[in-house]
Amino acid sequence: GFFCVSTSYRAEPNPVEGRHETIFPMFEFEMKGGVDELKKMEIELCEYLGLPDLEIETYDDWSNKFNTKELDHDHESTIGSGMITDFPEWTSPFWNMARNEDGTSKKIDVILGGMETIGSAERSTDKEQMRNTFYTISDGQYADLIIKLFGKERVEKELEEFLEFDFFPRSG
């Protein structure tokens, strides 16, 4: 695998004080292996750092515990230390994330100190699924924005060039 440390800039539409920063350090990693290897590594990382055991539940199980459809920052605060897995499609998982047979994404959020601290997922190897979700996530608004910014010809050319790669199970 490999990693990098960079600075991230993000303009959240409705920032929560103390939770959303416009500029923050970002530690990113990519590793060989699917979501099971990813989950194992993240659990081992938390153990190595001496953090409390994580309560691990799917998105639907967490939302059922809180009697809600959508998890928000108040729910994450209540979770404290935990892991949210298997995100439903309506949460708009990124287009290159792998999907389970039930349509949920192979995505993991690690909640530490009541906040999403690690956001990770298995990358897809299914070229048709990636092409389709590129155009359909967030009701098509993501693709529309990228096309508006860079032009349809360039976006479609670069998407098709990306999809020509030979993909293998990886996550980050």
Labelled PLM ranges:
Residues G1-G172:
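A translation/RNA-centric and nucleic-acid-associated enzymatic feature enriched
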